[in-house]
Amino acid sequence: MSALFELSAVGVRFGAVAALSDLSLRINAGERVALVGSNGSGKSTMLRLLHGLQRPTAGRLRAQAASRQAMLFQRPFMLRASARANVALGLWLAGVSWGLACRQAMQGLARVGLAEVGERSARTLSGGQQQRLALARAWVLAPEVMLLDEPTASLDPHAKREVEALMADFGAGRDGRPMTMIFASHNLGQVKRLASRVLYLERGRLLADLPVQDFFNAQRLQATAPAAHLFVKGELV
């Protein structure tokens, strides 16, 4: 199986703070990987590292150069423009003519159930609509790898279900090729539904790397999660 990312003893420090320490692992094409751990465990830093927004300060990271990536944040940035223009901009920057980019943007918005808001200002949309718009913005670029940093954390239950359904749909890929999806989440139910593999981080260290079924085995979970961690209504806090 082709490795999209290979980390060897990778570390990231911000001054005296070790955000990641001695991280060694491979992520293969087509995997659906959940990053779990309490706040400050290194999940966001790892996503930024994989996306090229952060360089390792120790060790080595190898990434497949040809892979097209998209990253979604918990609170996506919206331009002061229409929803259609927000989606079209990435295509235009990739060399697509503006007219074609706008047509493809509308197809992307329809894909996430937002065709009716194409001409509305993106900043007037609800949080759930903005996150779906961000998914459309990524989808039209046909990424092979999608990185998501707690994309449903700030959404209401209905919007969470909508975005999660789209994540599952997108993770299935297109043209018979599954997309590689790596996402950070505190929601263990979401992890169980969407992931095939779980990386458990704490204080920048990888404590467990398990198939999702093994992670949720009661004995394994108890052995993996230190007693100081609390699980409240399916959320790891």
Regions found by a protein language model. Name each.
Residues V36-S38:
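The feature captures the beta-strand-to-loop junction immediately N-terminal to the Walker
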Residues G99-V117:
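Conserved ABC ATPase "signature" region
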Residues R205-L230:
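Conserved beta-strand-loop-alpha-helix hinge in the C-terminal portion
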